[in-house]
A protein has these predicted regions:
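Anion-binding and metal-coordination hotspots
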Residues: 1-19, 32-574
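Conserved active-site/ligand-binding neighborhood in enzyme cores
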Residues: 22
Length: 574
């Protein structure tokens, strides 16, 4: 009797790793507890749906709802084992996933989820919380602007101001960069008033006083600083050069340049981080109708790296301004417009110098050219008896552009200076430590880069309703938390053992690294094409899994995940 061999295949790749990490954080239970599930909904609960969708996003680098259903139906055995529930063909339908986004869009629900998730994260994993970094970013999309929508015209950090924007405010733990809280706002909102609500949420999530909150100059509003000081926390941020503060900052820097104020070299071990000085000043502000008094340390510091960067920018502006000045008075010729008035030339030169911010640094010299032209009066052919008329044509021409070395030297002395403020006592945060802490604030900027880049791809979002835009943005920040955990835990494990890992770079199998990225770690599983094969022949059936390599086992070990996440998928894998 002839028996038919039937083979079925499921690509496993990094799915067990992602869902295993989510299960370790009890993410499905946290989401279920706060989002809830309709009493008539059958099959997977909303928390399980969200975890499955997160696995799809991180594994396939795609956040579209429409593609999740086919992906899940191609892996029923894998997802059933990892999610602990049978997978029906309708589980990951567009309607069900849309319901998850709607529940995630509710502010109270989202706040409760972030509180519980942070508690679960610090319970499972050890985090060094040296401070909290706050910042904002924007995301564009091809959406129609509506009065009540979250997509609005506003400033774009992706250089797409022609498209509607949404704004993401986030707070991350330093130095790990793990997200603590995230708020979604309409794209036209200014940053300044958005810091205080986020600070209040973070304070409730972390539940610890005395933390150091760092941010950029948009966080330096007096009301924001007062809010932090009133709750016995600390802040660190640069002051903006706007309004009255700009005048104060210039005077503090002038005192150094003119030799009135001495500075101290800032050493970090054998590395010099710059120079600077600090002084204290008392501040007062109203918080919730009550006065708040505190002492602020003003730190005027110079960064050699920043000075070099500003010097290079200044030289580019010089060159551009000089080229534009010379182009104002081209040689006479067809199509060459000539300036025939001294006031017009002077006004044009002033506009060029001010536009490139080099006023006083360049001096242009010019001269007046007069040309006498004699012609016949009236129309017609000339002759000896025709009357003539003599005209004097005037044009102005630049003869040179000279750099004012004394003014340039004075400008160079002012390059690289920045003023930052903190209310932390000096015994907790010295001047050098404050400089090092602020300059080391790359963690949240990199988190934003990961959020916008593959596999998450925040821009653009392929949903249209305001609730779904907000919900999907928040779902992607959950995916970012998982991706960050993958990265930080593997790096921590390698650092503890003083090891490096090879095999993560395509085309360079022997290249090693001590700081692998989360994306490359996931790609190491995807490139292996780990496949679960279902073999059926007559009444006999079995599951077989592509063997894990030593690299995969090592990465799982650093993540504190068992290899049984993979091997248990097949009862007779080899």
């Amino acid at each position: 009797m002839t028996q038919t061999l039937i083979l079925g295949h499921e690509r496993v790749d990094d799915i067990p790793l992602i869902i295993g990490l989510a299960n370790k954080l009890h993410l499905a239970e946290v989401l279920d507890h706060h989002m809830g599930t309709h009493r008539l909904q059958q099959g997977l609960h909303n928390g399980q749906l969200a975890v499955g969708w997160l696995a799809y996003i991180l594994s396939q680098a795609d956040h579209r709802k429409s593609a999740v259903r086919d992906w899940a139906n191609g892996r029923p055995h894998t997802l059933e084992y990892l999610l602990g529930h049978p997978i029906r063909a309708v589980e990951f339908s567009d309607d069900r996933l849309g319901g998850v986004l709607y529940r995630l869009s509710e502010d109270a629900t989202w706040d409760a989820i972030e509180r519980s998730l942070w508690t679960a994260t610090v319970t499972v994993y050890e985090f060094t919380l040296a401070g909290i970094r706050l910042d904002s970013t924007t995301s564009y999309g091809y959406h129609r602007v509506t009065d009540e929508g979250v997509r609005q015209r506003g400033h774009s950090k992706d250089h797409r101001p022609d498209l509607p924007q949404l704004k993401v405010m986030a707070a991350a733990a330093e130095p790990s960069g793990h997200l603590i809280a995230c708020d979604v706002h309409a794209g036209q909102c200014a940053d300044d008033p958005l810091y205080t609500p986020l600070l209040q949420r973070v304070r409730g999530i972390v539940g610890r006083p005395g933390l150091l909150y760092a941010g950029d100059c948009k966080m330096a509003a007096l009301s924001t600083r007062a809010e932090i000081a009133a709750h016995h926390d600390f802040y660190l941020m640069p002051l903006p050069r706007t309004g009255e503060t700009a005048t104060q900052v210039d005077s503090w820097i002038t005192a150094i340049v003119e030799g009135v104020q001495e500075t101290t070299l800032l050493w970090d071990g054998e590395r010099m981080r710059g120079a600077g000085y600090e002084f204290e000043r008392p501040l007062r502000a109203m918080v919730d109708g009550s006065p708040v008094y505190w002492t602020e340390r003003v730190q005027v510091v110079r960064s050699p790296t920043l000075a070099q960067r500003q010097q290079a920018t200044l030289e580019k502006r010089w060159a551009a301004a000089e080229a534009e000045l010379r182009a104002l008075t081209p040689p006479p010729g067809r199509g060459k417009r000539q300036l025939r008035d001294a006031d017009t030339l002077q006004a044009a030169m002033t506009r060029v110098l001010e536009r490139h911010d080099v006023a006083g640094l360049l001096t242009a010299t010019w001269e007046r050219h007069e040309t006498t032209v004699t012609g016949y009066v009236g129309r017609g052919r000339g002759g000896p008896d025709r009357p003539t008329r003599t005209q004097v044509q005037v044009r102005y021409a630049l003869t040179g552009v000279r750099r004012n070395e004394e003014a340039i030297a004075a400008r160079r002395h002012r390059l690289g200076w920045r003023v930052q403020v903190t209310n932390a006592p000096a015994d907790r945060l010295s001047l050098c430590q404050a400089v090092r802490h602020y300059r080391g604030g790359w963690s949240l900027a990199r988190a934003f880069h990961l959020l916008k880049d593959l596999p998450l791809g925040l821009s653009p979002l392929f949903v249209w309703k305001a609730e779904q835009i907000t919900g999907l943005t928040r779902l992607l920040t959950l995916a970012l938390r998982l991706l960050t955990l993958v990265e930080t835990q593997v790096r921590h494990g390698l650092e503890q053992r003083q090891e490096s890992v090879a095999g993560l770079y395509e085309g360079a199998p022997t290249r090693t690294t001590e700081r692998p990225t989360g994306t490359r770690i996931l790609q190491a599983f995807a490139r292996a094409q780990l496949t679960l094969t279902h073999v059926r022949m007559g009444r006999s059936t079995g599951w077989y899994l592509t063997p894990l390599s030593s690299l995969h086992e090592r990465l799982l070990q650093h993540l504190h995940l068992p290899t049984s996440l993979y091997t248990a998928l097949a009862d007779n894998s080899s």
